[in-house]
């Protein structure tokens, strides 16, 4: 059984961590307490768009994936109604690279017009593939408003 440790840093960041000495890999999950529920009903998709923009580079790291891959890591992210989760895995000896990448984009995301246009297209294509081009793919979008009527 793993001992789960919880801390709140001086900047308010909540840290939950546990150690597994049976592996040489480290997993980092950065979870933002924001998702589709925070969007205006007439302006949806921003949580997912920002998820993608987080991979567009930061002020000090123009390409997020290159240094991560050089450190032997991999990453992905997902968004739902309640949270946006970014995760990466790296070999234990390169955990500082993972923290460096996450902290740099947390503090200095490169929010350029070019990146916005590229990622907007990617998000729209994902929506088409997952929802519009699938039988009953739009059911969740149609039923969701009915599930939360007050």
Region spans (language model):
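Short, glycine/charge-rich beta-strand/loop segments that flank catalytic centers
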Residues: 79-87, 114-125, 141
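Scaffold signal of the M16-like zinc-metallopeptidase fold and its non-catalytic homologs
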Residues: 53, 57-58, 98, 105, ...
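M16/insulysin-pitrilysin zinc metalloprotease superfamily fold
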Residues: 57, 89-122
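N- or domain-start disorder-to-order transition segments that initiate the globular core
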Residues: 1-24
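M16/MPP (pitrilysin/insulinase) zinc-metallopeptidase core fold and M16-derived inactive scaffolds
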Residues: 27-91, 133
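Stable alpha-helical elements in mature extracytoplasmic
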Residues: 42, 46, 64, 95-98, ...
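Histidine-acidic residue clusters that define the catalytic metal-binding segment
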Residues: 1-7, 86, 144-150
């Amino acid at each position: 059984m793993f001992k789960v440790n919880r801390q709140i840093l001086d900047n308010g960041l909540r840290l939950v961590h546990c150690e597994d000495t049976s592996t040489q890999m480290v997993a980092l999950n950065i979870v933002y307490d924001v998702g589709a529920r925070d969007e205006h009903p007439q302006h949806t998709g921003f949580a997912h768009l920002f998820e993608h923009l987080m991979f567009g580079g930061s002020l000090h790291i123009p390409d997020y994936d290159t240094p991560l891959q050089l450190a032997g890591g991999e990453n992905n992210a997902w968004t739902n109604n309640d949270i946006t989760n970014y995760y990466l895995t790296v070999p234990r000896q390169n955990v500082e690279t993972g923290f460096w990448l996450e902290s740099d984009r947390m503090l200095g995301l490169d929010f350029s017009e070019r990146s916005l246009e590229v990622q907007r297209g990617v998000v729209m294509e994902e929506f088409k593939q997952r929802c519009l081009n699938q039988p009953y793919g739009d059911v969740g979008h149609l039923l969701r408003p009915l599930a939360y009527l007050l």
